[in-house]
Structures are given as structure tokens and as C-alpha cells.
């Protein structure tokens, strides 16, 4: 709809509304002003009218006149009837298809819960969204578009795929029964259905945020010349209650700044969340309109069906619009749950003028009045306006009824979200409501209905999808493989962070792979020494660089570019992780494998955005998460909030995340190379979490025969016959120093082992243990490495002791795990390591204690360790 037409419609509606507004002290004068303004528009045009309005606003501000908010429009459809795009489809056939899908979705959930009440499931959400989906499937969702589906509506998507022949009746019968490989997962899970679902949206709020950054990544691919994405759309179906999640709104301004007109949000405004109304005492539609419009989005209200058009046409005094404005959502929910007689009495009969507007209508006529989200004609018009709008992202606020069509058993009811069972009477009423050709026995037995491959419905459905390019959702994995170059790190005194930046630069400079590398930071590039990449590779900006940067005369100046390679996201870990997720799934979303590296303060990863990382695992993401300034004692002065001691424990719980904590540059190089090779050449559905620190120290050359152990998680650095010392990350150097203390001060020979991954060692041990449990042979890598060694084993890391404890079941003999349990502190590294009892002296004392050495008391005195102090986790 043209902006001018929307403006005219809005002004006409507001004019009528203000004429009867009781707060208007002089309606006649108001009418004169409005008539004068109409005459101005008629005589001199909209541009002149806009100019004068701006002048008036400026003048009002100068005179300190309070101004009302101007972000809201009247509570009716944004698209006037005269501007409505004609519906091109066969409405009768599409409604029959929709009714069949509705039945099969309902039958799927109810059947599952009759057999196994603990399975759960949802009926009401899809009941409210069915027409929104169907118009998209029949007319708008192209096969190369991306669609983020509202997760609770998954049964409806399954039911449609059943009609399309892509899912079997057996699969529908096994809804939420997956372990035997014949069922369907609860929500949208690519990990569980890797050929079907593309995007996991089950955790509320992550879908909207991920969708925005995915749409932006599509532009990134286009602007960098990697892939043509122009013409493709991204649709995100979200719930109005879901918009209360902070993540749902977090990316709105980014989408507007970048002009993402490839992005369309459809907010299913059924006015209900799980327990009750979303805004019982207000209006979620008006609230969301203000938020989206204020952020710079194009807003389309889809509130009322075609049967409301004659009522608005009869509303000469604006009384209908007034009544709609004053009705809060709690009342609208009640109207949804009740019949036409109730609606006449409590809504329409409030004003005599309004009563007259519907005087010709029966109670049944009133009961049949549709909300906009249930009218395919109005939905089509809104979608058409959205796809044709340029320069802005669009949000469609579609008003619906939760549990639509479920009658007294569910429509608009407070508990409808939890409704999983319907009795026979309710099922028969549902059948009759949607004119389904089912016998009473079919209904009672909850039989799925398919009209037949040669039926009009199926032929029509197939023709529509053929015209749009194919079926959705469908996850298609690229088969292209990218070669990974060798990586070299010269021995020198530096931090593992600087080693990482060198490795990243080598990959980015590679002739074949370089363009596919996506460096991502959340406003900490300088902290990690990545400013060296600014000038050469550029920072991505959809606008390029419209200013001359302050440091433009410097060699490494801050360079933004439309084809920039670095994604500098600002202070938003959730946004940066969403960009990483888009890049890490590009191989399946766009058929273009990419290699993203997101580096961040390690404490602000799994602890801050762990839910997004879990979604990445579900998405089968491929890429590197790099936890910088890692370790509770290695990041010295920052203190309690910033010092990470737990991320590796969290990472160990993510099945397809391979987590490493290297100490030396050659370890990091081996891990990055092997990870890139596995993901790009081997096409393994894994991602890597690697921690790097900011402590400078010498990095030796790689020992012979260390490669396998580095990747498997454990290898020996130094021989010793009396005690085995294991260390990971920065604390490995304390372990080496402890071995030297033991030899120098106490004459004890200690072997030193580098643990690059306690997580990989644990998983290897679990596999071996499981094999033995089932009667096969199995030996853990830890057991293989330590076989034949002497003495107890002492392990230390810069993380909580539970990390080192991960391998306890597989360590032969006595095992002591040291870690940084407790809250962090601001101090020097030496002081912090002494405080957390992971410095060389404490490790040496732990070894003596494990050996039950009589030298222990003397060692405590010599090293100044007071055994009477409270443990660090209690201080």
C-alpha cells in the first residue's frame, strides 16, 4: 500500500475518532482545522502538507507545547479496502486444504496424549496461525526463502508435509516419540530432523533475534560478492507473548539501520500467552506498533477480516473505531471465547450509534466476524504489501484468536495453551465447524485424513509449491568442500590470543579459503589485538563509511566498508553469537560453507548466551567460538564478574561442541587446523570452543609425536617416575614449574602431561566404558597414556576443579583435581594462583600429599602455605 494512501486512511479514521472524543473541548474548531488541512492536501499536495506539519511541530516544541506520541495509528487494518491487492488463488480450495491440515494437526496431538498423557503438545497456537501459514505456503514462501516457524505451531507444519507426501502417517502417529527413529520432534529441531527443519525456535526470543542477524548475513554475503541473495525473503513467525523476551526486541534497530527489506516479521497477536492475556489491561498491538515504528520498521496492522469492511464503511461518526480503541485485550479475549449474542450485548450495545451499525446482523452473523489473521484475503494483501515494500524491514501485526475453531473447549480460553485432549463431542464440533468429510467413527478414532493424490486439493497444493520452487521447510546441505591450508606459528614470547590472531590472518589471506572466513567480535577487537586486520580486510557496514575516521592517517585505521569482512557487532554478545550462528549454518541455509570465528571474553559466552549456543548445537553449526581473556587467574585485574572459571564445564555438556584449552601456540595451531579440516573438508556437524589467554610467555616448538595427543586431549611433555602432573591452558606452566620444584627441593621425579581437553578425554572414556559394558573391548585414551606409569596423578586447570574431575573415572590409581573454585578477585596472576591454590607451590604440595610424603609439613612451612585458612570457595 502506498505511504500516501496509508496516511489518508489514518487521517480519515482519526478525524472521525476525534469528532466524538469527549476530551475535545471544541469539536467544531477541531473540525475546522482538519477541514483546512484536507483542503491544503487537496490543493498543494502531500509534500507541502508534510513540510507544514514539520514546521508546526518545530514551532510547538519551541513554544514548549507538550506533544502526544505519534507512533500509533488507528486500531484497524493499515491497508484500506481500496488499496487491497486482489486475492489470486482459489479461496474455496485453500480453505478446504487449511481445514484438513487443522484436523490432522489436532488429531496428531490428541492421539499422542490419549495414548501417552506425558507426551504433551500444543493445539491452540497452530489453530490461531493456520491461515497465516497457509497463505504463505500457497503464495509467498519461495523454496529459497528462509522461514522461522513459531515453534508451538509445529504440528501444523507436520500436517501439511503429510499432505505433500513428505511425512508418513506412521510418523504422524509417532509424534513426540522419536527414540526409535520413526517419530516427529516436539518443535523445530534441525539436529533431530536434519532434512526438514532449518532453524530451532523453541526457546522463546531466540527466533526473532536469530532471524534478524540471519537476514543481515544474507546482505553480508551479497555485499561481499560471495552469493547472490537479492530477491530472497526471510519470514519470521513469532508470538505476541514471545515479544516480552529481551532477545525478541534486541535486534530491531540493527534491522532498520541496515535497511533489511528482505526481512518480514509476522507477529501472531492472539493476545494470549501461556497463563493468560499478554496485555490484559492494555493493547499489545498498539504497544508493538509503537516499538517497531520507533525502531524504524514498516508496520502493517492486520486486525480485521473482510466482514468488518461494511461495518467500518457505516461508521460515519467514528464510534466503532472509538469502541475498538477503548477495549483492552482482556476484553477482546473474552469476546473471542464467547458467542455473537454476548458480543452484541457487551461490545456493540455500549453506544446507540454502534448498536445501529450492526442492527441488520444476527447473533450468528456477529459470531462469524473474523479477525484479520483468519482471513486469507486480508492476509494476502498484507503479505503482498510486505514483500513489495523497499528500504525497511516489515512487521505484520496479525490479530487472531488463540484456539480458533476449538469452540467452548479452547477458543480464547485461559487454559487453551495447555489443551491437549478433546472429548468426542468437541472433536465432532471441530469437524462440523470446518466441514470435514469425516464419519463419526473417523472422528472418535482420530483418523488422519488425506483426500488422495489425485484430489483437487492435493493437485492444487502441489501446483502452488511447484510454482514457488519446491517444498518448505527443507534443510539442504551443501556438498562443496573447502581445502584448509597448513598453519604455522613461530616459537616466540607472546600470548595465545596473539597466536590466534596470527592463525586467523593466515586463514584470511589464503587464496582459496580466505574469503569464507568470518571474524566476529563484540566490540573487543583491540583487546584481542585484532586492529591489525581493520585496514586490510575492513569492517562490514551496509552503508560503507560515510565519515572520515579520527585515526585515518594511521597505518591501522578504523576502516568500515560495504564489502568488509569483519563483523564488529558492538556491545551485544547475543547479537554477535547470532551472527556467528548465521555464518556457521550458511552451508545449509545458503549452500555456501563459511568458517566463522567469534572471539569474546570467555565469561560472556556459555554463561551469558548459553541458550543461543545450545541453539547453535541444535542447528548443527560449524565454526569456532574463541573464549578470549580466559581463565580465572589469567585475566588478572578485572575481578569477579569477568574472570571465567566455568565455561569449559558448560561446554562439556554440549554434545557436538569440541572444547580445548591449549597452552602453547603449536597446540592451538593443531587444533584450529584439525577443526577447520573436519568442518570444511570432512563436513562434520561439530563446532569448536577454544580458550585463549592474554598472558605473554615463551612458546616452544612442537615435540615429536605430539599431534595425536594434542587432538585427543592428552600428551606427555616430560618423563618422571614418581608422580604424574597434568595441566591445561595457562596452568600447564605452573605444573611445569611444580615439577621443577619437586625435583629441586625434594628430589622427586615428576612427569608432566599437557591436557588440551578434559572434555574430549571424558567423552573418549565414556565410549570405552560403554563398549566394555556391552561386552566389547575399549580402552580410554587416558588409560592408554597413563598405563605403566608410577605414582598418583595430580591435575590442575584455571577452571573449577569439576573440569579436571571429568576424567576421574578413567584415571588409574589416586587422582587429585585442583581448580579455581570460588569467586574471582582483582590482583596479580601470581597472587590469584596462590589464592586459588593452583600455583606451582600448591601443586607441588598436592603431589607430596598424594604421595603421603613425610616431607609435606616441611614443604608447607617452606612455601608459606597455611593449612588452617578457609578454602577459596568459602572466602
What spans do the regions from the language model cover?
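Short, positively charged and aromatic/hydrophobic N-terminal segments
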Residues: 1, 6-8
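Non-catalytic terminal/interface segments that mediate subunit docking, oligomerization
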Residues: 87-105, 126, 133, 145-146, ...
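Thiamine diphosphate
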Residues: 14, 177-200, 206, 220-231, ...
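N-terminal amphipathic, basic-rich helices that act as targeting or association modules
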Residues: 12-168, 494-510, 521
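Glycine- and acidic
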Residues: 19, 36-39, 86-94, 112-121, ...
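A structural-propensity feature for long, helix-poor, extended segments
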Residues: 236-237, 243, 611-632, 637
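Glycine-rich phosphate/pyrophosphate-binding loops
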Residues: 144-145, 219-228, 585-605, 624, ...
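Cofactor-binding active-site loop characterized by glycine-rich and histidine/acidic residues
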Residues: 86-101, 105-115, 122-258, 281-282, ...
Amino acid at each position: 500500500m502506498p505511504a500516501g494512501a496509508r496516511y489518508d486512511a489514518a487521517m480519515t479514521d482519526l478525524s472521525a475518532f476525534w469528532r466524538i472524543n469527549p476530551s475535545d473541548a471544541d469539536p467544531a474548531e477541531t473540525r475546522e482545522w482538519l477541514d483546512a488541512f484536507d483542503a491544503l492536501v487537496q490543493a498543494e499536495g502531500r509534500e507541502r502538507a508534510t513540510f507544514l506539519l514539520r514546521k508546526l511541530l518545530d514551532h510547538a516544541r519551541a513554544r514548549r507545547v507538550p506533544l502526544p506520541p505519534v507512533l500509533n495509528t488507528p486500531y484497524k487494518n493499515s491497508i484500506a479496502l481500496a488499496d487491497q491487492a486482489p486475492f489470486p488463488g482459489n479461496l474455496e480450495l485453500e480453505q478446504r486444504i487449511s481445514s484438513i491440515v487443522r484436523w490432522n494437526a489436532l488429531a496428531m496431538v490428541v492421539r499422542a496424549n490419549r495414548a501417552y498423557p506425558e507426551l504433551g503438545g500444543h493445539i491452540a497456537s497452530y489453530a490461531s496461525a493456520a491461515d497465516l501459514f497457509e497463505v504463505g505456503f500457497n503464495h509467498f514462501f519461495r523454496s529459497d526463502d528462509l522461514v522461522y516457524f513459531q515453534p508451538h505451531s509445529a504440528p501444523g507444519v507436520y500436517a501439511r508435509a503429510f499432505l505433500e507426501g513428505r511425512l508418513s502417517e506412521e510418523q504422524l502417529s509417532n509424534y513426540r516419540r522419536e527414540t526409535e527413529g520413526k517419530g516427529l520432534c516436539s518443535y523445530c529441531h534441525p539436529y533431530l530432523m536434519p532434512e526438514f527443519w532449518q532453524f530451532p525456535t523453541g526457546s522463546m526470543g531466540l527466533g526473532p533475534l536469530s532471524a534478524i542477524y540471519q537476514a543481515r548475513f544474507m546482505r553480508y554475503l551479497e555485499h561481499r560478492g560471495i552469493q547472490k541473495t537479492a530477491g530472497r525473503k526471510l519470514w519470521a513467525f513469532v508470538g505476541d507473548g514471545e515479544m516480552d523476551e529481551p532477545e525478541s526486541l534486541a535486534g530491531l534497530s540493527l534491522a532498520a539501520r541496515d535497511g533489511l527489506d528482505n526481512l518480514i516479521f509476522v507477529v501472531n497477536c492472539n493476545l494470549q500467552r501461556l497463563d493468560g492475556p499478554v496485555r490484559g489491561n492494555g493493547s499489545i498491538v498498539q504497544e508493538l506498533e509503537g516499538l517497531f515504528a520507533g525502531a524504524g520498521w514498516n508496520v502493517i496492522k492486520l486486525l480485521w477480516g473482510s466482514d468488518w469492511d461494511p461495518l467500518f464503511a457505516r461508521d460515519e461518526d467514528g464510534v466503532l473505531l472509538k469502541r475498538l480503541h477503548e477495549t483492552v485485550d482482556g476484553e477482546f479475549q473474552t469476546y473471542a471465547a464467547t458467542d455473537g449474542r454476548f458480543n452484541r450485548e457487551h461490545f456493540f450495545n455500549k453506544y446507540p450509534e454502534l448498536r445501529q451499525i450492526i442492527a441488520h446482523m444476527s447473533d450468528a452473523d456477529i459470531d462469524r466476524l473474523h479477525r484479520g489473521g483468519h482471513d486469507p484475503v486480508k492476509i494476502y494483501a498484507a503479505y503482498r504489501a510486505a514483500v513489495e515494500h523497499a528500504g525497511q524491514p516489515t512487521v505484520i501485526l496479525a490479530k487472531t484468536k488463540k484456539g480458533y475453531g476449538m469452540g467452548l473447549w479452547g477458543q480464547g480460553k485461559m487454559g487453551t495453551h495447555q489443551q491437549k485432549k478433546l472429548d468426542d463431542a468437541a472433536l465432532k464440533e471441530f469437524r462440523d465447524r470446518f466441514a470435514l468429510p469425516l464419519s463419526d467413527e473417523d472422528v472418535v478414532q482420530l483418523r488422519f485424513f488425506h483426500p488422495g493424490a489425485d484430489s483437487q486439493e492435493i493437485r492444487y497444493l502441489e501446483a502452488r509449491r511447484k510454482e514457488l520452487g519446491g517444498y518448505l521447510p527443507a534443510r539442504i546441505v551443501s556438498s562443496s568442500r573447502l581445502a584448509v591450508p597448513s598453519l604455522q606459528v613461530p616459537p616466540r614470547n607472546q600470548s595465545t590470543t596473539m597466536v590466534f590472531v596470527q592463525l586467523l590472518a593466515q586463514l584470511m589471506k589464503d587464496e582459496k579459503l580466505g574469503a569464507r572466513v568470518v571474524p566476529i567480535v563484540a566490540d573487543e577487537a583491540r583487546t584481542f589485538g585484532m586492529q591489525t586486520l581493520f585496514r586490510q580486510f575492513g569492517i562490514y557496514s551496509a552503508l560503507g563509511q560515510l565519515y572520515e575516521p579520527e585515526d585515518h592517517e594511521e597505518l591501522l585505521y578504523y576502516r568500515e566498508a560495504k564489502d568488509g569482512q569483519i563483523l564488529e557487532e558492538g556491545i551485544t554478545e547475543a547479537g554477535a553469537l547470532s551472527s556467528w550462528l548465521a555464518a556457521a549454518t550458511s552451508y545449509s541455509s545458503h549452500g555456501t560453507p563459511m568458517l566463522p570465528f567469534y572471539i569474546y571474553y570467555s565469561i560472556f559466552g556459555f554463561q551469558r548466551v548459553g541458550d543461543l549456543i545450545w541453539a547453535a548445537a541444535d542447528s548443527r553449526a560449524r565454526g569456532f567460538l574463541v573464549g578470549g581473556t580466559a581463565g580465572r587467574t589469567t585475566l588478572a585485574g578485572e575481578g569477579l564478574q569477568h574472570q571465567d572459571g566455568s565455561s569449559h564445564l558448560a561446554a562439556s555438556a554440549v554434545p557436538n561442541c569440541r572444547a580445548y584449552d591449549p597452552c602453547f601456540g603449536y597446540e592451538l595451531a593443531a587444533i584450529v587446523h584439525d577443526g577447520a579440516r573436519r568442518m570444511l573438508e570432512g563436513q562434520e556437524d561439530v563446532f569448536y570452543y577454544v580458550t585463549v589467554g592474554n598472558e605473554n610467555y615463551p612458546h616452544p616448538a612442537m615435540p615429536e609425536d605430539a599431534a595425536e595427543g594434542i587432538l585427543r586431549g592428552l600428551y606427555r611433555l616430560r618423563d618422571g617416575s614418581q608422580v604424574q602432573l597434568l595441566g591445561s591452558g595457562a596452568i600447564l606452566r605452573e605444573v611445569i614449574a611444580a615439577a621443577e620444584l619437586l625435583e629441586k627441593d625434594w628430589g622427586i621425579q615428576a612427569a608432566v602431561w599437557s591436557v588440551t581437553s578434559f572434555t574430549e578425554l571424558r567423552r573418549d572414556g565414556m565410549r570405552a566404558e560403554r563398549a566394555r559394558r556391552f561386552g566389547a573391548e575399549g580402552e580410554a585414551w587416558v588409560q592408554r597414556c597413563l598405563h605403566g606409569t608410577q605414582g598418583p596423578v595430580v591435575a590442575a586447570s584455571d577452571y573449577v576443579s569439576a573440569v579436571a574431575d571429568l576424567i576421574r573415572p578413567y584415571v588409574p590409581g589416586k587422582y587429585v583435581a585442583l581448580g579455581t573454585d570460588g569467586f574471582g578477585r582483582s590482583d596479580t596472576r601470581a597472587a590469584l594462583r596462590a589464592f586459588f591454590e593452583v600455583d606451582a607451590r600448591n601443586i607441588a604440595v598436592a603431589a607430596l600429599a598424594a604421595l603421603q610424603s613425610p616431607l609435606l609439613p616441611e614443604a608447607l612451612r617452606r612455601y608459606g602455605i597455611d593449612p588452617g585458612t578457609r578454602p577459596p570457595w568459602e572466602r
